[in-house]
């Protein structure tokens, strides 16, 4: 019977001595002599390893020099329970085959390797235990997000990656150019910065929809928080207010994080250890703490009371909160998750619903301790003329977005939604401080690997 290491650990209570199993994986370590050899194996299904025990007869059949770190092997043998040992079981090998040898210049070695170096080899870094844990958590979070929306009757829609418009109106789009005289699409085309506008179209027919897709920003930023290509989760709900929007965002985050912790205990244990056992308490506190809703103008007032703490001390109504401000609000003022609502319209996107004061818009940024902004959302502007006027104020061309404007003419119901940067969520759950370490192949300004 072929088994993964994850399956063996899951079924530990039901395992019996001398059961026969077949396993595949990569060598983590190999030690021993001519009489007995211990080979540690990992197959990528878990951060936990399996110890293979080779006795004299099997050792003679293989070249032990080829059992080096990273070598791909197949093994068959009987499982022996070892409850008193460090590992709960081991596989006594009756057959071993080296499927793929490793050159001596394999970049990953037993000694600790820096994250900076591992970023130079994104095609190999997942073969370290740290990145194995990160990517397993990432995959589980993605699964749980789909599960959450399915259980809440949302329809998953596929939005285009190539688009004719800048959905955020910020001019940070990447142009698709085939270098021909005539545009391939007979007009300029861009890599999408958001799927929200297309999601709005489908919400006006399916009521509750969501997208989970790559998005692109031509931001020339070289920070630990920015990527040129990243994944976004963007639900859109017809007949929904800002209050409904915040409620579903809060529920989604807490459900997804809770379920991921439960399903990935070994990976979370490793990551918690690397954060001095502070990661799991932080996440569990978030899961159980009620979200606070705070008006932007109140947040600015509270920041003014503590402005001496900040590098950016020029705090005023109309400013876009910096990362240090967001973290301070969630960590020191609220001491938990907080939704900042009603930002000034001049620092937010054109499609947000304009409040009666004509100065602010019905939107929210959800902030969490340790990372700051995790989600941004809003109630959408449902009034055709208001939307046209706002686009004109921002010099956003109307023609490419006429289809979006026309939605307001054809049975449009008040709509709300939000965007969650998936990599920001992975950072929060894993405790990893650099966004380039939570995506398999990071794309940033100035360089592209693979």
Swiss-Prot record:
GO biological process: asparaginyl-tRNA aminoacylation
Lineage: superkingdom: Bacteria
Gene3D superfamilies hit by this protein: Bira Bifunctional Protein, Domain 2, Nucleic acid-binding proteins
Keywords: Aminoacyl-tRNA synthetase, ATP-binding, Cytoplasm, Ligase, Nucleotide-binding, Protein biosynthesis
PROSITE patterns per UniProt: AA_TRNA_LIGASE_II
MF GO annotations: asparagine-tRNA ligase activity; ATP binding; nucleic acid binding
Primary subcellular site in the record, as a coarse category: cytoplasm
Enzyme class: ligase
Pfam families associated with the record: tRNA-synt_2, tRNA_anti-codon
Entry's EC annotation: 6.1.1.22
Compartment(s): Cytoplasm
InterPro entries: Aa-tRNA-synt_II (IPR004364), aa-tRNA-synth_II (IPR006195), aa-tRNA-synth_II/BPL/LPL (IPR045864), Asn-tRNA-ligase (IPR004522), Asp/Asn-tRNA-synth_IIb (IPR002312), NA-bd_OB-fold (IPR012340), NA-bd_OB_tRNA (IPR004365)
Family annotation (SUPFAM superfamilies): Class II aaRS and biotin synthetases, Nucleic acid-binding proteins
Catalytic activity: tRNA(Asn) + L-asparagine + ATP = L-asparaginyl-tRNA(Asn) + AMP + diphosphate + H(+)
Gene Ontology cellular component annotations, sorted alphabetically: cytoplasm
HAMAP family: Asn_tRNA_synth (MF_00534)
Oligomeric form and interacting partners: Homodimer.
Family according to the record: Belongs to the class-II aminoacyl-tRNA synthetase family.
Name of the protein: Asparagine--tRNA ligase
Organism: Metamycoplasma arthritidis (strain 158L3-1) (Mycoplasma arthritidis)
């Amino acid at each position: 019977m072929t088994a993964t290491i994850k399956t063996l650990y899951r079924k530990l209570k039901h395992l019996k001595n001398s059961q026969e199993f077949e396993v595949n994986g990569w060598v983590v370590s190999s030690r021993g002599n001519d009489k007995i050899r211990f080979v540690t194996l990992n197959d990528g299904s878990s951060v936990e390893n399996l110890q293979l025990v080779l006795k004299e007869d099997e050792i003679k059949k293989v070249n032990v020099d080829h059992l080096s770190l990273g070598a791909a092997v197949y093994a068959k043998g009987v499982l022996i329970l070892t409850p008193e040992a460090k590992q709960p079981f081991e596989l006594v090998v009756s057959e071993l085959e080296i499927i793929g040898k490793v050159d001596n210049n394999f970049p990953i070695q037993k000694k600790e390797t820096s994250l900076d170096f591992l970023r130079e080899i994104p095609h190999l870094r997942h073969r370290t235990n740290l990145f194995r844990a990160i990517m397993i958590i990432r995959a589980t979070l993605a699964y749980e997000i789909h599960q959450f929306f399915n259980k809440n009757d949302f329809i998953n829609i596929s939005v285009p990656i190539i688009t004719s418009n800048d959905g955020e109106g910020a001019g940070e789009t990447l142009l698709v150019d085939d270098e021909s005289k005539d545009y391939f699409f007979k007009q300029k085309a861009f890599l999408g910065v958001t799927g929200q506008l297309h999601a709005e179209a489908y919400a006006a027919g399916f009521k509750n929809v969501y997208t989970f897709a790559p998005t692109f920003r031509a931001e020339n930023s070289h920070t630990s928080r920015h990527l040129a290509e990243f994944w976004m989760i963007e639900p859109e709900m017809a007949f929904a207010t800002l209050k409904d929007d915040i409620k579903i965002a809060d529920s989604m985050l807490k459900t997804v994080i809770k379920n991921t912790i439960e399903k990935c205990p070994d990976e979370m244990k490793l990551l918690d250890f690397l954060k001095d056992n502070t990661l799991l308490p932080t996440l569990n506190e978030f899961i159980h703490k009620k979200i606070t809703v705070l008006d932007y103008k109140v947040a600015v007032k509270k920041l003014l009371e503590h402005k001496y703490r900040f590098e950016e001390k020029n705090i005023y109504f109309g400013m876009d909160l910096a990362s240090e401000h967001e973290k301070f609000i969630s960590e020191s003022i609220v001491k938990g998750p907080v939704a900042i609502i009603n930002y000034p319209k001049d620092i937010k996107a054109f499609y947000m619903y304009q409040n009666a004061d004509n100065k602010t818009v019905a939107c929210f940024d959800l902030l969490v301790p340790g990372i700051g902004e995790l989600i941004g959302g809003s109630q959408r502007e449902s009034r055709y003329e208001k939307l046209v006027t706002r686009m004109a104020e921002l010099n956003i061309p109307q023609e490419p977005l006429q289809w979006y404007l026309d939605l307001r003419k054809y049975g449009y119901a008040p709509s709300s939604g939000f965007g969650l940067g998936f990599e920001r969520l992975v950072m929060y759950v894993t405790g990893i401080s650099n966004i380039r370490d939570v995506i398999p192949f990071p794309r940033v300004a100035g360089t592209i690997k693979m």
